[in-house]
Amino acid sequence: NNRISGSLDIYQQKTSDLLMQKKVPSSTGYSLAWDNVGKTENKGVELVINTQNFNQKDFSWNTDYTFTLNREKITELAGGIDRDISNGWFVGHSIKTHYGLEKIGIWQLDEAEEAAKYGEKPGRIKIKDQNKDGSIDNDNDRVILGSETPDFVMGLNNTFKYKNFDLRVFMYWRQGQMLHSEANG
Protein backbone atom coordinates (compact mmCIF):
# COMPACT_ATOMS: atom_id res chain seq x y z
CA ASN A 1 0.00 0.00 0.00
CA ASN A 2 2.95 2.34 -0.75
CA ARG A 3 3.75 3.10 2.90
CA ILE A 4 7.51 2.69 2.37
CA SER A 5 9.57 4.12 -0.46
CA GLY A 6 13.16 5.10 -0.96
CA SER A 7 16.17 5.38 -3.19
CA LEU A 8 19.79 4.31 -3.23
CA ASP A 9 22.40 6.20 -5.22
CA ILE A 10 25.98 5.01 -5.64
CA TYR A 11 28.40 7.38 -7.31
CA GLN A 12 32.01 7.90 -8.32
CA GLN A 13 33.30 11.15 -9.76
CA LYS A 14 36.77 12.05 -10.92
CA THR A 15 37.71 15.71 -11.36
CA SER A 16 40.73 17.02 -13.21
CA ASP A 17 41.99 20.60 -13.49
CA LEU A 18 40.51 21.29 -10.07
CA LEU A 19 40.16 25.07 -9.83
CA MET A 20 40.69 26.33 -6.28
CA GLN A 21 42.04 29.35 -4.47
CA LYS A 22 45.66 28.79 -3.53
CA LYS A 23 47.75 30.73 -1.02
CA VAL A 24 50.47 32.76 -2.74
CA PRO A 25 53.50 34.63 -1.37
CA SER A 26 52.62 38.01 0.15
CA SER A 27 55.24 39.60 -2.13
CA THR A 28 52.70 39.23 -4.96
CA GLY A 29 50.44 41.75 -3.24
CA TYR A 30 47.70 39.11 -2.92
CA SER A 31 46.97 36.40 -0.39
CA LEU A 32 45.11 34.02 -2.74
CA ALA A 33 45.03 33.24 -6.45
CA TRP A 34 42.88 30.88 -8.53
CA ASP A 35 44.85 27.94 -9.92
CA ASN A 36 44.40 24.48 -11.41
CA VAL A 37 45.71 22.56 -8.42
CA GLY A 38 45.23 18.91 -9.33
CA LYS A 39 42.81 15.99 -9.51
CA THR A 40 40.33 14.51 -7.05
CA GLU A 41 38.11 11.47 -6.73
CA ASN A 42 34.77 11.31 -4.91
CA LYS A 43 32.79 8.16 -4.32
CA GLY A 44 29.94 7.38 -2.04
CA VAL A 45 26.45 6.18 -1.26
CA GLU A 46 23.24 8.09 -0.58
CA LEU A 47 20.26 6.27 0.93
CA VAL A 48 16.80 7.78 1.43
CA ILE A 49 13.89 5.95 3.06
CA ASN A 50 10.42 7.52 3.32
CA THR A 51 7.65 6.00 5.45
CA GLN A 52 4.01 6.83 6.03
CA ASN A 53 3.69 5.72 9.63
CA PHE A 54 0.12 6.83 10.20
CA ASN A 55 -2.40 8.37 7.81
CA GLN A 56 -5.99 9.13 8.87
CA LYS A 57 -8.46 11.86 7.99
CA ASP A 58 -7.28 14.51 10.49
CA PHE A 59 -3.85 13.17 11.48
CA SER A 60 -0.79 11.88 9.63
CA TRP A 61 2.81 11.06 10.53
CA ASN A 62 5.58 10.61 7.97
CA THR A 63 9.27 9.88 8.46
CA ASP A 64 12.19 10.54 6.12
CA TYR A 65 15.58 8.97 6.87
CA THR A 66 18.76 9.89 4.97
CA PHE A 67 22.24 8.41 5.13
CA THR A 68 25.24 9.64 3.15
CA LEU A 69 28.73 8.18 3.00
CA ASN A 70 31.28 10.10 0.91
CA ARG A 71 34.98 9.45 0.41
CA GLU A 72 36.92 12.17 -1.36
CA LYS A 73 40.64 12.36 -1.88
CA ILE A 74 43.23 14.23 -3.86
CA THR A 75 44.71 11.87 -6.46
CA GLU A 76 47.24 14.28 -7.96
CA LEU A 77 48.62 17.75 -7.29
CA ALA A 78 49.87 20.14 -9.97
CA GLY A 79 53.60 19.95 -10.56
CA GLY A 80 53.76 16.27 -9.58
CA ILE A 81 54.21 17.03 -5.88
CA ASP A 82 52.62 14.85 -3.20
CA ARG A 83 51.94 17.64 -0.69
CA ASP A 84 51.29 21.37 -0.58
CA ILE A 85 51.70 22.13 3.11
CA SER A 86 50.84 25.84 2.93
CA ASN A 87 47.41 25.00 1.48
CA GLY A 88 46.90 21.78 3.45
CA TRP A 89 46.66 19.54 0.37
CA PHE A 90 48.05 15.99 0.43
CA VAL A 91 47.73 13.27 -2.21
CA GLY A 92 45.57 10.46 -0.83
CA HIS A 93 43.73 12.73 1.61
CA SER A 94 40.69 15.00 1.62
CA ILE A 95 40.88 18.52 0.20
CA LYS A 96 39.95 19.86 3.64
CA THR A 97 42.69 18.13 5.62
CA HIS A 98 43.91 19.52 8.92
CA TYR A 99 47.69 19.47 9.28
CA GLY A 100 49.44 20.59 12.41
CA LEU A 101 50.96 19.76 15.76
CA GLU A 102 49.24 16.91 17.60
CA LYS A 103 47.97 18.00 21.01
CA ILE A 104 48.05 15.11 23.48
CA GLY A 105 46.96 16.74 26.72
CA ILE A 106 47.96 19.28 29.33
CA TRP A 107 51.29 19.25 31.12
CA GLN A 108 50.63 18.20 34.76
CA LEU A 109 52.41 19.34 37.92
CA ASP A 110 54.24 16.02 38.25
CA GLU A 111 55.55 16.46 34.67
CA ALA A 112 57.22 19.84 35.29
CA GLU A 113 60.74 18.50 34.69
CA GLU A 114 59.79 16.81 31.39
CA ALA A 115 57.80 19.90 30.28
CA ALA A 116 60.85 22.11 30.90
CA LYS A 117 62.83 20.06 28.35
CA TYR A 118 60.37 21.37 25.72
CA GLY A 119 60.34 24.93 27.07
CA GLU A 120 56.92 24.37 28.61
CA LYS A 121 55.44 24.25 32.10
CA PRO A 122 52.45 22.61 33.81
CA GLY A 123 49.09 23.94 32.65
CA ARG A 124 50.15 24.39 29.04
CA ILE A 125 49.16 22.22 26.09
CA LYS A 126 51.34 19.15 25.60
CA ILE A 127 52.43 18.62 21.97
CA LYS A 128 53.58 15.21 20.72
CA ASP A 129 57.24 15.08 19.70
CA GLN A 130 56.61 13.03 16.53
CA ASN A 131 60.26 12.40 15.66
CA LYS A 132 61.36 12.11 19.31
CA ASP A 133 64.27 14.54 18.91
CA GLY A 134 63.50 16.40 22.15
CA SER A 135 62.27 19.50 20.32
CA ILE A 136 58.87 20.57 19.01
CA ASP A 137 59.12 22.27 15.61
CA ASN A 138 56.82 22.83 12.64
CA ASP A 139 59.15 21.19 10.13
CA ASN A 140 59.44 17.81 11.83
CA ASP A 141 56.51 17.40 14.20
CA ARG A 142 53.41 18.36 12.21
CA VAL A 143 51.16 15.53 11.03
CA ILE A 144 47.79 15.06 9.34
CA LEU A 145 45.28 15.44 12.16
CA GLY A 146 42.03 14.73 10.33
CA SER A 147 39.56 16.03 7.79
CA GLU A 148 36.54 18.33 7.63
CA THR A 149 34.83 15.65 5.51
CA PRO A 150 32.62 13.60 7.87
CA ASP A 151 32.76 9.79 7.96
CA PHE A 152 29.01 9.83 7.38
CA VAL A 153 25.95 12.08 7.60
CA MET A 154 22.47 11.06 8.73
CA GLY A 155 19.18 12.88 8.89
CA LEU A 156 15.82 12.00 10.40
CA ASN A 157 12.74 14.11 9.69
CA ASN A 158 9.35 13.42 11.27
CA THR A 159 6.33 15.35 10.01
CA PHE A 160 3.14 15.36 12.05
CA LYS A 161 -0.04 16.89 10.59
CA TYR A 162 -3.22 17.51 12.51
CA LYS A 163 -5.97 19.24 10.55
CA ASN A 164 -4.36 22.56 9.45
CA PHE A 165 -1.30 22.33 11.72
CA ASP A 166 2.11 20.87 10.88
CA LEU A 167 4.94 19.98 13.23
CA ARG A 168 8.32 18.95 11.83
CA VAL A 169 11.08 17.50 13.96
CA PHE A 170 14.43 17.25 12.19
CA MET A 171 17.63 15.70 13.50
CA TYR A 172 20.94 15.95 11.68
CA TRP A 173 24.09 14.02 12.55
CA ARG A 174 27.60 14.38 11.17
CA GLN A 175 30.09 11.81 12.46
CA GLY A 176 33.88 11.77 12.41
CA GLN A 177 34.89 15.18 11.12
CA MET A 178 37.22 17.88 12.39
CA LEU A 179 35.99 21.42 12.71
CA HIS A 180 38.21 24.46 12.43
CA SER A 181 37.50 27.65 14.33
CA GLU A 182 38.78 30.76 12.56
CA ALA A 183 38.51 32.56 15.92
CA ASN A 184 41.01 30.17 17.50
CA GLY A 185 43.33 29.89 14.50
Task: Annotate each PLM feature.
Residues G29, K39-E41, K57, Q175:
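Short acidic-hydrophobic sequence patches enriched in Asp/Glu that either
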